[in-house]
Amino acid sequence: LSRIMLAIKSVLNDTDNMNVLVFDEIDTGIGGEVGLALGRYMQKLSAKKQVLCVTHLASLAAHAHAHFFISKQELQGRTVTQVHRLRSEARVREVARLLSGTPESSLSWEHAREMIELYSPGKE
């Protein structure tokens, strides 16, 4: 459904009055070259709109202008959501976790750092 909305919003991009686009799990079932192409396209789309994208795909996260980590936990019977902006090493750690499932691998850190350097549109 998110990809259908991406297609519709892309066609209407220059004619609609929506300033914010939100995509939840747009990366479901994709990876590799398609994930990289989606990341490049989302960057292009973000030049004209504010784009918020919930993703679990490292290649899509590496393309972001800004990277946030959202977590939920239960405290005293209530669900509490926290949002943290990730910068520099924290961002590398999270992209490494998305790549390998564990951020402790030096190989995943190296790959994550390379992806961010290659695909991120600029310094945070």
Task: Please report, for each region that a protein language model flagged, where it lies by residue.
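GG-anchored amphipathic helix commonly corresponding to the ABC/SMC/Rad50 NBD signature/C-loop
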Residues: L1-L21, L45
